[in-house]
Each structure stands twice: as structure tokens, then as C-alpha cells.
């Protein structure tokens, strides 16, 4: 009888929660804030913007059609906005997405006169410009790639490219001719594989403008992947080899939204129908859930795991779905051959692997003598499994086999940032524009962890070797073995076990075990200074009594010679105003008082807005004073038995960064 308890619990829990599934928050993808112009607090523009957003998210908005636009105000204070819901979603899902997007507008793009917010189910957009009936294809682009490549054989690549173009161009024509400016396609490739495509324009566009926008969108998609999507503010396109849209909703008129008021009790026949539905539907759902639960536990009992990683970027990942067969990983890495080794990460070696289906992966094999225990291992899996952001490396699976613990990640072509930044033979490949792009990408990734993901995550080990670079030199934050999850209202946590890397750790964490979002901000500041200078913080050669990079940068700033910090490889080609501003931001991040360090949301605005005034930086943490006998704080060393001389404010800190 006791063996039935898991099923009974699953049944009751699923029954009680199944009716709340539709109320989950929409999946946020990206936002675009050009920061060309801003508005001030209490301005007429802000008042008009609030009125506009209220109108777009009102109960009377056009959720059934999935599109609405509005304009509020006059002349320079005029603001125009719109929402566009994906053509296959229900009015209720549309309303939920738009309302959620409106409620998060000011936290994502504060004080911006123009913005676009991309969600899985909808797009929200506003601007001080006239954005209606105009196809925008030169700004606000966002691309998502399925991490799985198609076969490397050239003729298969050409065949697949032709297939994608043929199908996508066909539905682009259909969408342009459709009043809803929306179309999908389903094409069987083989008995086991089907192609799915979707395109959509905002319905205010003319046929020609919609066609031009979709043509641009489709041509910018990476056809080397088995799935991809591209967004412009005015249109978007997507293809996959799985069913990602609601086929039953295509071609049928959307049902009306459910009434917000209580129904009348006078219609007896109507009430009887409601009672029947209310009784029958939960029973059917409960039976299906029970069957699914039985299959789930039966599968667990067999202890059989996948032989290749699942790459469906839209499925919510579970620990069970991530567990891979050890022998498959062993074969993918040629039995962890030295020829496959591509580096060393936290707690173990990293190998390149290729699965039988052609998927390239990075395999981290944890050392058997590693300090990372089962807690950290499971923590890394749980933390990373459901994160979805282009500036975070994605976990594809894991394996536990006796003493072996293995993590499988997406393969990132250019390895880590430190391989370029600190190698005299390679650092010349990092032009200033690339370094500036990398700084911005890291900032967006940290902002997602701190604010935009479902959980508040503190990384605790941000450093150059944990920033990976893909084929286009886009940064991806990696190695979440030391990350911690915060509660919704939690701003700080203490620990007696200090983990991380010296030189990147904030003073309050290194000395008192206190960590918060501002600890990651400190690490980000050190990274920014390293990217600008091309020098490691811990290997700094003493100059003018400076014993680390942070101290050196602070003294140059204080002396008015900040440009002397710049890496000689980029000194003649960099934009000096951007370099100085980034140095300024880096020094704000490494200030000794954590309260005075800016939040990542503020940093993102600082990096993209040249009009935002920056406060003067104050003394950094671990600032080395010119006196004999000062111990040096080194990087990449154990934190035990290491004394340092620092100056730290002992008052408690609070983090005001909003979620």
C-alpha cells in the first residue's frame, strides 16, 4: 500500500495545481532599448506613456484579434504603442502576456522614450516616433538559434537551406496577403521528421511592407541550425523540426475571452452545462495525470537514460529529462581522450564531444578529488537547467556513474574570454568594438540572473575564464557550481564557506562571507577593467605602488589619466569616450561600499545611454595603500589561511535592486 503513496500524492498535487497552469508568467525573451533619447520623471511624456500602456492592457483591448495600437499626446510628448500576440495563442493567453509585459516595462527600460519587448507569446512596443505602417528592419533585431547543428555534409546543408527558404518564403507570401499578417506551414520531411514554420507581421503593415520585412527576417536566419527564430520590431519568423505552435488554433476564429463578472443564475440549462463540464473535465484531467505519473515512475524504475541531449529550447527542463547515459558520453569524447580536452573548468577538465546524431557538446568531467560535492553538482544542474538567455551557456544533460559526475553543456566555439584577452598572440583579435559588445553581453546575462529570470541567482564566480565566446564572439556566462538562489524578498546571505576566485571577490564576501547581487556587480567591475586593459587583476606588475589592477585603475582615474589603462593593442583604434565611460562604470562597480555600487539594471542603462550622468566613483574595495607590509590579495588561490589588509565599512548592507 505504501508504494501507492507517490501516485496518490502526485494525483492530489496535480489536481490542485492543474487549474493554475494557464496563469504562469509569459516567457520573456529579450528587449531593445536604443537609449537615443530619454524622458525625465514627472514629465508629460511619462504621463502619456502610462496612459498608453494602460489602454493597451485594459480589459477592452483587442485580445481576440491579437493586435492593437494607440497614440497618446501631441508633438514632442506624443507616444505611439502597440502589442502583437502570436497568431496561434488564445485571447486569454494574449491578455496575460500583454498585461505582464506592461507591468514589467519600467523595470526593463527605465526612462526610455522607445522600447521593444519580446516574449514567447507577444510583443509590446512603444516609441516617440511614428511606428505605425512602417517596417523596421535596421534596429531592434533579436535572434534565437537552436544549439543543434544540421549534418556538416555540404550537400545536406544546401538541401536543408533550400528547404527552409522554400517553405518560409511560401508562408511569407501567404502572410502578406492575409489580413492578420500571419501564416504557418507543416511539411513532412521523412516518416519521423516534420518541418514547422511560422511568420507574422504587425497587421498595420501593407502587403509590400510585410513582404519586405519577412524577406529580411528569413534571410537573416542561421540555416545551419535545425531551428531558429528572428525578430524585427515589425515582423518575425521561426522554423523548427518540432511542433512549436498550436495547430488546432490555426485557421479557426479565436473564442471570446471568459467574462470577468460572475455569470447569471437565471439560465438553468446553462448552469447544468457548467456543472457537467466542471465535474467531467477535472476527472478526465486527473485520470490522464495519473497515467502520466505511472509512466513516469515506471520509467524511473527502469533506470534508462537518454543517449543524446534533448535540444528543444522551449520545453521546461526537468532533472529526469537531463540525465544522459554515461556510455554515450564516453563514446562522444573518445573515452575522455586527451585530444578531446579543450580546457579546465571549475572542479574538473572539459572535453569536446560529438554524439551519434552529430551534436557537438562540451563535457565537464568533475575530478574525483574535486572540492565540489554532490550538493554543488546538483546545484549546478538545478540552477542552469531552466535558464534561457543568449548570454548564458546552456546545460544539455548530466550523468552520475559510480564516482563519475559529468555535466554536458552546449559547445561554444571560441572557448573562454581569457584565452583571447590575456594571450599576446590572440588579444589583437579583440578589437574595441568586440570588447564593448562583450561587456554589454555579460551585463545582460547578469541582469537576467539577478532580475529577469524566475529565480534570483547570484553567480559568485564571475571571471574571464567563466565567460565563453561563441562563433560570433558573443559572450556566454558559464560555470554555475557556486551559484546561489535567493528568495523573492532576499537581498543578502551569509556563508561560512567562502568559495570563488580571489581578485574577483568583493571585500564583504571575502572577509565576512556576505554575498548579494552587489557581490556579482563587484566581479563584473573587475572584468570590465580587465577587458579594457587586457591585463589580469592578480598578475599585475607593481607600478607606482599599485599591487593590483583595481588599484592601478583607481589611481589613473584620480590623476585624470584614465586612457593610460587601455590595452596598447586597441589604444589607437578604440573610441576614447566609450573607453572612459566603461572605466568609469567599472570603478563604480568595485567601490568599497556595496550600497554605492549600481545595480545591474542601472549598469545596463549606463552602458547604452550616453546621456545618463554617472556619479563620481569612490575608493574601491581592496584599495592598496602605499605602506610597507601590505599583503597582496591573489586570484585563483584557496581562500583558507590567507590574510589581507583591507578597509571595509562594518555596517550592514541592503540591496535595493528590484525583481
Swiss-Prot record:
Region of interest (Disordered), residue spans: 626-659
Residues the record lists as Phosphotyrosine modifications: 409, 509
Protein name per the record: Cysteine-rich receptor-like protein kinase 7
UniProt biased composition (Basic and acidic residues): 648-659
Gene Ontology biological-process entries: response to reactive oxygen species
Organism, as annotated: Arabidopsis thaliana
Record-stated family: Belongs to the protein kinase superfamily. Ser/Thr protein kinase family. CRK subfamily.
Residues on Cytoplasmic side: 295-659
GO molecular function, one term: protein serine/threonine kinase activity
Feature: compositional bias, Polar residues: 636-646
Amino acid at each position: 500500500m505504501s508504494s501507492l503513496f507517490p501516485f496518490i500524492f502526485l494525483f492530489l498535487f496535480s489536481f490542485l495545481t492543474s487549474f493554475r497552469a494557464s496563469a504562469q508568467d509569459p516567457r520573456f525573451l529579450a528587449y531593445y532599448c536604443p537609449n537615443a533619447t530619454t524622458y525625465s520623471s514627472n514629465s508629460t511624456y511619462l504621463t502619456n506613456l502610462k496612459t498608453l500602456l494602460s489602454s493597451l492592457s485594459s480589459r477592452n483591448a483587442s485580445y481576440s484579434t491579437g493586435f492593437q495600437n494607440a497614440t497618446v499626446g501631441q508633438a514632442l510628448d506624443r507616444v505611439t504603442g502597440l502589442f502583437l500576440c502570436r497568431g496561434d495563442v488564445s485571447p486569454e493567453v494574449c491578455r496575460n502576456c500583454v498585461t505582464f509585459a506592461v507591468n514589467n516595462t519600467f523595470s526593463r527600460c527605465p526612462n526610455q522614450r522607445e522600447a521593444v519587448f519580446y516574449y514567447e507569446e507577444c510583443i509590446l512596443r512603444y516609441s516617440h516616433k511614428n511606428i505605425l505602417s512602417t517596417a523596421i528592419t535596421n534596429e531592434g533585431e533579436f535572434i534565437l538559434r537552436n544549439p543543434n547543428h544540421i549534418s556538416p555534409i555540404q550537400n545536406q546543408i544546401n538541401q536543408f537551406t533550400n528547404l527552409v527558404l522554400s517553405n518560409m518564403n511560401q508562408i511569407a507570401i501567404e502572410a502578406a496577403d492575409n489580413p492578420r499578417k500571419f501564416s504557418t506551414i507543416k511539411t513532412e520531411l521523412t516518416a519521423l521528421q516534420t518541418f514547422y514554420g511560422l511568420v507574422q507581421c504587425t497587421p498595420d503593415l501593407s502587403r509590400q511592407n510585410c513582404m519586405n520585412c519577412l524577406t529580411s527576417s528569413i534571410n537573416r536566419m542561421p540555416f545551419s541550425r535545425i531551428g531558429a527564430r528572428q525578430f524585427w520590431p515589425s515582423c518575425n519568423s521561426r522554423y523548427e523540426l518540432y511542433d512549436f505552435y498550436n495547430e488546432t488554433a490555426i485557421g479557426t476564429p479565436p473564442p471570446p475571452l471568459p467574462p470577468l463578472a460572475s455569470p447569471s443564475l437565471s439560465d438553468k440549462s446553462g448552469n447544468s452545462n457548467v456543472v457537467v463540464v466542471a465535474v467531467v473535465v477535472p476527472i478526465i484531467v486527473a485520470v490522464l495525470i495519473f497515467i502520466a505519473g505511472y509512466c513516469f515512475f515506471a520509467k524511473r524504475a527502469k533506470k534508462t537514460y537518454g543517449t543524446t541531449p534533448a535540444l528543444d529550447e522551449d520545453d521546461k527542463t526537468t532533472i529526469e529529462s537531463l540525465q544522459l547515459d554515461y556510455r554515450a558520453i564516453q563514446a562522444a569524447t573518445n573515452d575522455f581522450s586527451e585530444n578531446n580536452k579543450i580546457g579546465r573548468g571549475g572542479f574538473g577538465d572539459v572535453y569536446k564531444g560529438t554524439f551519434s546524431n552529430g551534436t557537438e557538446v562540451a563535457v565537464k568531467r568533475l575530478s574525483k578529488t574535486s572540492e565540489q560535492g554532490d550538493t554543488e553538482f546538483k546545484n549546478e544542474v538545478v540552477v542552469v537547467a531552466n535558464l534561457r538567455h543568449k548570454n548564458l551557456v546552456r546545460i544539455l544533460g548530466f550523468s552520475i556513474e559510480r564516482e563519475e559526475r559529468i555535466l554536458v553543456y552546449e559547445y561554444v566555439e571560441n572557448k573562454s574570454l581569457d584565452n583571447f584577452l590575456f594571450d599576446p598572440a590572440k588579444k589583437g583579435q579583440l578589437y574595441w568594438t568586440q570588447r564593448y559588445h562583450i561587456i554589454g553581453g555579460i551585463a545582460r546575462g547578469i541582469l537576467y540572473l539577478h532580475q529577469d529570470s524566475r529565480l534570483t541567482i547570484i553567480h559568485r564566480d564571475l571571471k574571464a575564464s567563466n565567460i565563453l565566446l561563441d562563433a560570433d564572439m558573443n559572450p556566454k556566462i558559464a560555470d554555475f557550481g557556486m551559484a546561489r538562489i535567493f528568495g523573492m524578498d532576499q537581498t543578502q546571505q551569509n556563508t561560512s564557506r567562502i568559495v570563488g576566485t580571489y581578485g574577483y571577490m568583493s571585500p564583504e564576501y571575502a572577509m565576512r562571507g556576505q554575498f548579494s547581487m552587489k557581490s556579482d556587480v563587484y566581479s563584473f567591475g573587475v572584468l570590465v577593467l580587465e577587458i579594457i586593459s587586457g591585463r589580469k587583476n592578480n598578475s599585475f606588475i607593481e607600478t607606482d605602488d599599485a599591487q593590483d589592477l583595481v588599484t592601478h585603475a583607481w589611481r589613473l582615474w584620480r590623476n585624470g589619466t584614465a586612457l593610460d589603462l587601455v590595452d596598447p593593442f586597441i589604444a589607437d583604434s578604440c573610441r576614447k569616450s566609450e573607453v572612459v565611460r566603461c572605466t568609469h562604470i567599472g570603478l563604480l562597480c568595485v567601490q568599497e561600499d556595496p550600497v554605492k555600487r549600481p545595480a545591474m539594471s542601472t549598469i545596463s542603462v549606463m552602458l547604452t545611454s550616453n546621456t545618463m550622468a554617472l556619479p563620481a566613483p569612490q575608493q574601491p574595495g581592496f584599495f592598496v595603500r602605499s605602506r610597507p607590509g601590505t599583503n597582496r590579495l591573489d586570484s585563483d588561490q584557496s581562500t583558507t589561511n590567507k590574510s589581507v589588509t583591507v578597509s571595509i565599512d562594518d555596517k550592514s548592507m541592503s540591496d535595493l535592486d528590484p525583481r
